[in-house]
Amino acid sequence: MQLFTSFSLLAVASFASAHGIVTDISSGNDWWTLSNPFRDPYMNPVPDRVGWSFFGAGNGPVPDFTTKDIVCNQFAKPGKLSATIAAGSDLTFYWTVWPESHKGPVLTYLANCNGDCSQVQDPSTLSYFKIDHAGLEDGVWVSDKIIANNNSWTVKIPSDIAPGNYLVRHELLALHSAGQDLGAQFYPVCINFKITGSGNAKPAGVTFPGAYKRTDPGILVNIYNGIKSYIIPGPAPYVEGGSPGNSAEPQPQHTSTAVSTAKTASTSSLTTSVTITSQAPSNTANPPQSITTTTTPKPQSTNINPTSLKTVTTSLRREQLINLCLDDINRQIAAAQPKNGGPVNFSNIEKKREDCYKI
């Protein structure tokens, strides 16, 4: 029991400081908790979820977005349940605390499973059409807006979509290392849905891998040179009564729906009640009225550990050094986890995580 408790604290601490996952989703009065790679594998029995599991992947990015991992994350297995939602409804995604340095766009897709989504063994065989995206608008990254809105983002399910079983694919793309090949960091999650309604639209889609290219201007990009515009990867979102097309500037603006106070409070208590160190970012139930963005020096490496931090140039901000350190911790956590659960001793990793905050 002590091992599980220690590990749980380590996992949540890493959530609060580097990278992230979607923990919950909601629509109206309905709320669903998704699969958690740091918790669910160690529960007996392992709970059935509407979200696809990715045990062993941790909360870090997909290592190579040109592989099938880009669809639903590494080691992805279909959720055994499906959530029901009406076409035209809002759907809110609740992320763990997102690092301010991980600036980039948010993207959401739908794919018809052509049957029970829990029976889909290879999600790369499905066709995905985009229903929402947002990137850089008036100098503000959408990732900053997500942070300000208690680490949540709301999209609308198109009202004219034909009813059926759909996979919702939602992701954040972090661009802090995107100036180098394969440096863009994708954080995808897949969720099973049964969409109800009377629509008949069946938009054409794209496939993953393949929809994103290594040299796409929104993927291989230096965000530290004062860019004024940004081309979001993938196709343009489907418009009710219309059809998706190629993504090009100017990007359509996203109208975000505010998260209710009750749900915000629930998410806030989940992320703040287990914060271990004072340096870790904390969630807030009162988002700031204005958002400011800062131009920060580009991290010079994403492969670092606490013992080598003293050799890193001092031109980096302290929070960037902490992020680099925690990147390495996340990789160690993922490597230490057995794919199918089981006891693990994380004491050494916990010590290294504590050292990250002593920089």
UniProtKB/Swiss-Prot annotation:
Which applications in biotech or industry are described for the protein in this UniProt record? Lignocellulose is the most abundant polymeric composite on Earth and is a recalcitrant but promising renewable substrate for industrial biotechnology applications. Together with cellobiose dehydrogenases (CDHs) an enzymatic system capable of oxidative cellulose cleavage is formed, which increases the efficiency of cellulases and put LPMOs at focus of biofuel research.
**Where does the record say carbohydrate is attached?**
150, 345
**Binding positions (Cu(2+)):** 19, 102, 187
Which terms does the record give in the GO molecular function aspect?
metal ion binding; monooxygenase activity
Q: What is its EC number?
A: 1.14.99.56
Compositional bias (Low complexity) at which positions? 255-304
- How is its cofactor bound, per UniProt? Binds 1 copper ion per subunit.
**Disulfide feature:** 72-190, 113-117
Its subcellular locations are:
Secreted
Task: Name the predominant localization.
Answer: secreted
List of residues binding O2: 176, 185
Q: Its Gene Ontology biological processes?
A: cellulose catabolic process
Q: Which reaction does it catalyse?
A: [(1->4)-beta-D-glucosyl]n+m + reduced acceptor + O2 = 4-dehydro-beta-D-glucosyl-[(1->4)-beta-D-glucosyl]n-1 + [(1->4)-beta-D-glucosyl]m + acceptor + H2O
- What is the residue range of the signal peptide feature? 1-18
- The membrane spanning regions, by residue number, are none
UniProt-annotated stretches for the region Disordered: 241-310
Cofactor dependence is on:
Cu(2+)
Family per record: Belongs to the polysaccharide monooxygenase AA9 family.
Described function: Lytic polysaccharide monooxygenase (LPMO) that depolymerizes crystalline and amorphous polysaccharides via the oxidation of scissile alpha- or beta-(1-4)-glycosidic bonds, yielding C1 and C4 oxidation products. Catalysis by LPMOs requires the reduction of the active-site copper from Cu(II) to Cu(I) by a reducing agent and H(2)O(2) or O(2) as a cosubstrate. Active on cellulose and on xyloglucan for deconstruction of plant biomass.
Q: What is this protein called?
A: AA9 family lytic polysaccharide monooxygenase B
What's the source species' lineage?
Eukaryota, Fungi, Dikarya, Ascomycota, Saccharomycotina
